Structures are given as C-alpha cells and as structure tokens.
Amino acid sequence: MKTTFDTVADALTVLRQGGVIILADDESRENEGDLVALAQDITPETVHMMLREAAGLMCTPVGPGIAERLGFTEMVAESTDPHQTPFTYTVDGTFEATGVTTGVSAMDRAATIRQIANPTATRADFNAPGHTQPLTAKEGGLATRIGHTEAAVDLAQIGRASCRERV
C-alpha cells in the first residue's frame, strides 16, 4: 500500500488556520501519529475531538524556555522510557487565571492549554497536579531529539512566523 504525506508547508497552513494535523513518525520508531494543533488556538471542541478520536493521553509539548518560565519540571529524575518522552508533572490552570474549575472537562483543558501558550503566564497561573500533561522539548528541537514533542514545538515555532513566543 502506498502512503502519501503532506508537505511541511501544507501542515503549517493548516496549523496557522487553527486546524489539526496528524504528525507521523518513522515506522522504525513508534510508528504512530499524534494529533497536533497550536495551543493558542485550541478550543474545547478541538480538545473533545482529540480525546474522542485519538483515545490516548493528551499532551501539550512546550519549548524549554516556556517550561522554565512556567516552572514545569521533569516528572522523574531518570526516565526508563526507551523513547525518553519528556514528561513534566500535570497541571490545571487556576480559576483566577483561566476560569478552570475541575480541570477535567474539554473546556477546562482548552483554557489550561491556552494559558500555557500565553506569553505573560507565570507558574502562579497553574495548579499541580492537574489534567493537562506538558512535555518539554529538548533544546535544539529535532536537531537534538527525533520525537513528536520536538517536531510539534518546531512546527509551532516555524508556524508562528514573527509572532510572540508560542507553543
């Protein structure tokens, strides 16, 4: 069976328009696809669709600068994960900063994710533990680690053009 993939330029166009792409990795790695959208554009409807259709763990990849600014630290000191997925602890937006109540609804998760993308957000805007799972991309992105986390962050950085720092 022949597999066809879109170009990076096509993916960037979809992301810039607030859409969702499937980011696939190599058959020799995890051989899976992740649904990716830009955090600043995420809606409750998009979160709901991602949870319904992908039925897996929903994560929010961030660049190392954002992780540092928001105080997102590694979940474990030494990961035994063969792919070294860079999990941090989970968070919810605070009610004061985001209006989040329980954190579990699609509305609350979207608000938390948008706050993570907010360039004025601080650590005080989040409660932990929560229902949103940040992942911290390695410094240098795909040039440093070949993973969905780095690919998603690199696409977001390229896609933002000359806009402010975003996830």
Where are these regions (language model features)?
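Catalytic domains of riboflavin
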Residues: 1-164
